[in-house]
Amino acid sequence: MSVVNFYGQLSNTQQFDQIRINIASPDQVRSWSFGEVTKPETINYRTFKPEKDGLFCARIFGPVKDYECLCGKYKRMKNRGITCEKCGVEVTVSRVRRERMGHIELAAPVAHIWFLKSLPSRISTLLDMTMRDVEKILYFENYVVVDPGLSILQKGELLTEEELQKAKDKYGEDAFTASIGAEVIQQMLKELDFSKLKQELYEELQTTSSEVKKKKLVKRLKLVENFLESENKPEWMIMDVLPVIPPEIRPLVMLDGGRFATSDLNELYRRVINRNNRLKKLIESKAPDIIVRNEKRMLQEAVDALFDNGRRGRAAKNANKRPFKSLSDMLKGKQGRFRQNLLGKRVDYSGRSVIVVGPELKLHQCGLPKKMALELFKPFIYSKLELYGIATTIKAAKRMVEAEKSEVWDVLEEVIREHPVLLNRAPTLHRLGIQAFEPLLIEGKAIQLHPLVCAAFNADFDGDQMAVHIPLSIEAQLEARVFMMSTNNILSPANGRPIIVPDKDIVLGLYYLTLAFDNEVGAGMMFSDLAEMEHALYNKFITIHTKIKYRRNQLNAEGKMVPVIIDTTYGRLMVGELLPSNPNIEFKFINKQLTKKDISLVIDLVYRHCGQKATVIFADQLMKLGFKYACSSGISFGMDDMVVPESKSTHINKTQLEIKEFEQQYSNGLITYGEKYNKVVDAWSRCTDRVANDMMKEIATLPVNDAPNHQKINAIYMMAISGARGSFQQIKQLGGMRGLMTKSNGQIIQTPIISNFKEGLTEFECFNSANGMRKGQIDTALKTASSGYLTRKLVDVAQDCIITEKDCGTDKGIEVKSVIEGGEVIVPLAEKILGRTAAIDIFHPVTNDLILNKGELINEAKLEQIESAGLDRIMIKSVLTCESTTGICSICYGRDLATGTLVSEGEAIGVIAAQSIGEPGTQLTMRTFHIGGAATKGAEVSSVDASYDAKVKIISRNVVINSEERKIVMSRNCELLLLDNHGNEKARHKIPYGARLLVDDGDMVIKTQKLAEWDPYTIPIITEKSGKVLFKDMVEGISIRDVTDEATGIPSKVIIESKQYSRGAELRPRIQLLDAKGEVITLSNGLEARYYLPVGAVLSVEDGVQISVGDIIARIPKESTTTKDITGGLPRVAELVEARRPKDHAVIAEIDGRVEFGKDYKSKRRIIIHPIDETMSIEYMVPKGKHVVVNEGDFVKKGDLLIDGNPVLQDILKVMGVEVLANYIVNEVQAVYRLQGVKIDDKHIEVIIRQMLQKVEVTDSGGTTLLAGEKIDRHEFDEINEKAIKNGLKPAEAQLILQGITKASLQTRSFISAASFQETTRVLTEAAIAGKVDKLRGLKENVIVGRLVPAGTGYFMDKMRKAAVKLDEENV
């Protein structure tokens, strides 16, 4: 027996390794068929038997009943294989009616609509005609000249009926041949000589210079090559014979009441057969041409409707005016074959019920209702009953179970013992949505769930339901126990932190337990053992909050027990008792008021140092303790717990005065409406925060009147500070003031809600508040769908990303450093490199000791060494630089976050990455409505303060001193660094153009000193010389307009769009500075002093006035602020991973050089960059209205922005390369999630980026068969080049391209995966023509063909099977 047969025994299906798709030839269709369907009848309405030669004919498709012919002459198994001589039916199983096909011989050829109408149309591309023309021929509107003969007509020219008649009169009947219908298209396709055509196209491609023509030729050439390679014949796109799918797949069902329900396909087939039969008769009876032609057209339309109803013309509809579901519709969309039946299946052995909390369960257990268990485990019970001789037969066992005899329950107990069940809660957004538990039988009808796993399932007990599934085979049980047991899923795969963390009331209980109060009874007493303390507590000598001293034995580094005396409380010691003994887990970690964060850290520590088992036990005991004290603490929620601060009115009055001042400035015309809006919103924002802070201070310390020595602690404050429930956001609204509200479009309403919920809202406030609330509700409804869609796209693009080897051996890596924003370290380096591997050997900068070897995993211990060495950037390996040809290697990926060890082979990291990014998206969209539309907006940054005592260093310092002796920054890329004594960078701040510098290069500053300040709401345009103002190209009403403010009546001059006027097309509004002689002043960089003004700029000077250095001549208002929340964020993530061009995108400088403004072209401004080495300068055309962030004469670096906005990802890739691009995408995506406090590991985003960078675009074909402009898989390209180099040819050249995830999914190597994703018909059409082969490497295609996925255990089965095949080959 060969080795591979052993694997074949696992299933009785045929073993195959790849699937190929082709166009079926007419002969192939006939070979599949078991007979021709010639009649449109289905079944006889009296006998209910299928009609002979009809759509359900038993002779063609097989018997209706097992082993029984139609007339009943042959019955039973003994006659198997006999064909009845009376009715012609073969005696066999009725199952063959699911697999036997028939066919219809068409009386006239018919075009296949997929090849005609699926864009780009394959038939028209091959014939080099337009699709419209081909349709005219096919649908009998025009004739086409096949052979011009003696006439001057062109081959392929279209003629109408009249033109044909005229041509016949002119040249004679037989001078030329013109024809019509699918026959002629078929003939034209047959006549194509592909080898010759390929040669001609190649030559034409070399000679043509027109880009449009090149594109067209490349398309046609690609198609010709596809046909040559796949050995498909082009005439097969026109069908002579039509396959009929098996009848069981298009069933006819009898309903009660004698009516029939039928599949739409039967109706569509009937139309085809009717028209085909009619056409046969017409041709036989030599009917007039016009009638035959009409019938042929009808036949073509009937076949079109069968294949893809509604693709062309009006869809065929049924009696209820609903379009019929055609064959294409059977495959397409969520309800199609792919997504409904192949990727998602209903599961037997499953049940569902409501969940309730089970606090006395252990972490690996769940409570399963007895009734449910009995039903689910039936087969196991039957076999056991029979085995023990309790029941004699299965039938008897069945009766016993139905009667619920007492023996049955005993057997059930035994069957269930150590047989894990899977619990699943929909929506399953990440892999922790399905986990395995050991069932405990319980009374009642609800499933009991352990409280600690709720976070992973995102379950609560307000009526949630969960499904139970039973793993049946031993292998399945084993996998459930090893991989899916809840105790094996302690860490979240998204960020590697514990997900089994106490929550809600457990946290509250532990917080209460670890509180320590001064002035409690027995303060300062000393104890040496716990029993003694318990005694003291019982006799009320101390309370659990009393501060006491205690002698505790602790493990030291050598593993010996040493006694130490600690200051603590009895409550904290109770938690301390639960800690596993380990020198790394010190008592100090819990000797404090425990909040949710602290508890999470302790669990993390326990997991890292003591392993999984200890963690599970610890978490379970912690939960029980938390529940106990949450109950006995008696914490409640009272009206008096909401405290309104005394200072509230003062803050509000102060802010109202500020706003009056802004109104005044606005009335005087000093600021625009937009600026006023921004300032008002900002002032209220600050006021709300101040009130909230005062309230928090008052709540935190609250003396109670009746017992002066007691310090009670506020219940609401406890809930929030411990992290149990509620946020300070919500408390602020209860006791402070509700603050600003958002409108439904995300804009902030200027008047805030001054009241809070305790005082109650006024009518007007209530209305405003409802507006914000409604936004939250609507958001939730709309965004959930788009978030789910994003997850689906991510899974689809990354599904074939699997760990396939240990080490790919690459030397490449990426450099990471901590993320600094506004001078603050937001993400420390440690967080970015934990769990990654080093790309190079890393040495200590001072001692030069080796810290890390190349390829070594950076764990917590190594992290400490790196931090103490003070390294600020590190080269790590990354998925992006991994050189594995299929999949990714373990070393480049690093730590598997769910286990904390190096990732193992076969791990499906692509799916995990997609789930990690998608899951919080869905979560966050659902969380919006909790805060109820209150605006969360950070006040705009308008100054920089020193965060350390340090020395100032200024990069790109370019300042002028204005008339008030202030230093004004003139540089666009000025940066201010703070350095410590060793010259190491501690903070870095970007100083915007126009800011006032308050310190200078080399100054020493102290912490909190102000370094620079600026107006955050406008971008100024500043002069660097004094002179007289001269307005140029400012034509009233065309390029400039006096805008009179409605509120104040004060006019201000604003630059407007001048494109729409013919006179305005050439205008470039600018201000020039003249000297005393009236000549234009020259600036320091040698250019003239002229300042171009963008659309929307507000002038601050009048024509002809004298101004001095550093004066503002115009201001560009920034748009008003809208709230930042994830809804702004999710579309941003989608925009990034879809690689879309952002609206109003930035322009990036491609080289280093000096900026010059060239001559304008129509409505565009010309920006020219001259490089230093005087090579080719680069020109950019930008719309005139856009604000250019560089001035003439500025020096820009490669990658700098010339225009504000989000840069186009493709530009970053082209100019700055892969690493910068990846860094940009990672940071942008992380910024969205960070705003919501969601942590996702960078590597997940990197996996998605790797999938987006799979393809290259050929720039030069060299000696290969590739075409310039062709897009091809990176690895495929490398393979082709290797072959070329072997054969001594010039290799092709190509550049990496970035694809959006949708496009990348549709262009994967696997056509099955692409077809099940989107645009099914197009994908299948393309694949069939090219004769594509699916190697079945991804997860999706394997699920669809019904094999084990090549990931996890399936990966090793696959590997072993391949090894077995190899062994067999060697043995042979």
Swiss-Prot record:
User: What's a GO cellular component annotated to this UniProt protein?
Assistant: DNA-directed RNA polymerase complex
Q: Which reaction does it catalyse?
A: RNA(n) + a ribonucleoside 5'-triphosphate = RNA(n+1) + diphosphate
Q: Which residues make up the binding site for Zn(2+) 1?
A: 69, 71, 84, 87
UniProt-recorded Gene Ontology molecular function terms: DNA binding; DNA-directed RNA polymerase activity; magnesium ion binding; zinc ion binding
Per its UniProt record, what InterPro entries does this chain match?
DNA-dir_RpoC_beta_prime, DNA-dir_RpoC_beta_prime_bact, RNA_pol_asu, RNA_pol_N, RNA_pol_Rpb1_1, RNA_pol_Rpb1_3, RNA_pol_Rpb1_3_sf, RNA_pol_Rpb1_4
Cofactor(s), by name: Mg(2+); Zn(2+)
Q: What keywords appear on the UniProt entry? A: DNA-directed RNA polymerase, Magnesium, Metal-binding, Nucleotidyltransferase, Transcription, Transferase, Zinc
Binding-site positions, Zn(2+) 2? 808, 882, 889, 892
Query: What Enzyme Commission number(s) apply to this enzyme?
Result: 2.7.7.6
CDD domains found in the cross-reference section: RNAP_beta'_C (cd02655), RNAP_beta'_N (cd01609)
Q: How is the cofactor bound?
A: Binds 1 Mg(2+) ion per subunit. Binds 2 Zn(2+) ions per subunit.
Family designation: Belongs to the RNA polymerase beta' chain family.
Q: Which PANTHER family match?
A: DNA-DIRECTED RNA POLYMERASE, DNA-DIRECTED RNA POLYMERASE SUBUNIT BETA
The protein's name in its UniProt record: DNA-directed RNA polymerase subunit beta'
Q: Which organism does this sequence originate in?
A: Rickettsia rickettsii (strain Sheila Smith)
